[in-house]
Amino acid sequence: MINVLIIDDDAMVAELNRRYVAQIPGFQCCGTASTLEKAKEIIFNSDTPIDLILLDIYMQKENGLDLLPVLHNARCKSDVIVISSAADAATIKDSLHYGVVDYLIKPFQASRFEEALTGWRQKKMALEKHQYYDQAELDQLIHGSSSNEQDPRRLPKGLTPQTLRTLCQWIDAHQDYEFSTDELANEVNISRVSCRKYLIWLVNCHILFTSIHYGVTGRPVYRYRIQAEHYSLLKQYCQ
């Protein structure tokens, strides 16, 4: 399992991020910290090694950026993803200078959170896979692309235009409805697993956006809705 530490002084936000982490296979939250002092105690003194840190910038009496040089000088092996409402160029520049692996601006979509963690894991595994790389492999590792990269809107293997058309036609007919994977899968009579693959692709194409809701049991449910500014793209796949 990949051990994640969440640093945020807002208890509700920290809990929400903890639940996000719990939804991604292979990741677990091993602690939360509301102060940098508590965070350093966990990072440097805990028996559990921290693989990934989710770091807020704006804290009540502290600035999360102050932790980055501490980690850098200590040659800490934990990687950092910033999750913050800080969107100014200076803060982002300082964060990147200290090697943060990703930067999410609040509020963010659940799919973007999942992309950040799984993308980081993919690069980490790739770095541990080989001792040497050729240029194409290095390009893929650093840029996430290659010289012959395909159109990101091309359907991945296993997805069919016919099924996509059926899903998009249903979504088009329910433009004002925020739906779950289970609801759509039942309506168009396909498996939940297959339906989720299409929905993830539509989110990656910016046709849909996601939000997360919690029922009385506390179980998170992802819900989807059309992004109005990209409605024309959805209509293309309805033909």
UniProtKB/Swiss-Prot annotation:
Phosphorylated and activated by DcuS. GO terms for biological process: DNA-templated transcription; phosphorelay signal transduction system; positive regulation of DNA-templated transcription. GO terms for molecular function: DNA binding; DNA-binding transcription activator activity; phosphorelay response regulator activity; protein homodimerization activity. Pfam families: Response_reg. Residues 3-121 form the Response regulatory domain. Transmembrane segments: none annotated. This is Transcriptional regulatory protein DcuR.
